[in-house]
């Protein structure tokens, strides 16, 4: 009996030490970006020149790391699956790449949830693949998720992940920055969550001002209104600061909230609508700024089950905001029926006034 107790105590001690060692390792290797970081621009060698054209096309798309296509549900959204098969993930990525490669008329592409290396996407370097596809373009990648091991769900842990956001431009980028959002959780939870951010890219214009494009991916799964307000102020203060200098400002991406007063069109392209838990406050930006979205089709679907059109609740979380010195010509959701991502792309056409 005494021997059994000693063995049991040794096992318990080993488990405790293993757990402490794991937490210590994750803490030591935790990704800790600065509030503002200068980012490297990838692309062909070229001198930065003044942007002459005043009419521009942009597209934003959360590609769901090529892991959340129509066949998938997701454990974190009350589904059961953690990752697709390697074959399925490759199919999603091929289709996503094909779509992006076909956007010849689009000047700027803002992607969210794109992996450099992660178990959830079978270690495919999605950033490199997209960059090679768009080899005549300029791009900036910023990490917002880097963890050595995510231990959930316990029956099939997500494991290693290194992913983030990618801004792609047809024009040379004069400067690029990563701006960190505040952490939404305390230790130890923060060790396993995204380090949210937005990417700022700058382009000089012929009139002496800059076009400033912000690629954002705001927090999900946050019910504390004060945390969301704090996060939103980071980007809106930057937007207002740039506009006060006479610059042209475009912010787009996955805001994880409905735009102010959003109501879907009657048909909604055959989709079932749900109102998101979080609604963007109309007063979060000054009067004169434009919320650029499309109410004819959704950009996001719920992942508690595989996608069936008309059954899964859908909504819009992806859109643009443009400054008062920009005319919005068109905003359109490109309805891909969530075949390769749990988000649809949003496209806008704009015109810079007095450039």
Task: Report residues per predicted region.
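N-terminal, active-site-proximal structural segment of metallo-dependent hydrolase catalytic domains
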Residues: 2-162, 354-355
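A well-ordered secondary-structure block
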Residues: 36, 146-210
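Active-site beta-strand/loop signature of hydrolases that rely on acidic residues for catalysis
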Residues: 57-63, 92-123, 168, 201-203, ...
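Solvent-exposed loop/turn segments at secondary-structure junctions
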Residues: 65-66, 115-118, 144-148, 173-174, ...
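Surface-exposed cleft-lining segments at the edges of enzyme active sites
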Residues: 80-86, 114-116, 182-190, 217-226
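Conserved beta strand-loop-helix elements of the APE1-like EEP
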Residues: 132-135, 160-176, 204, 311-327, ...
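Short proline/glycine-enriched turn/loop segments at secondary-structure junctions
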Residues: 188-190, 306-311, 335-339
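Metal-dependent phosphoesterases centered on the DNase I-like endonuclease/exonuclease/phosphatase
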Residues: 222-223, 227-324
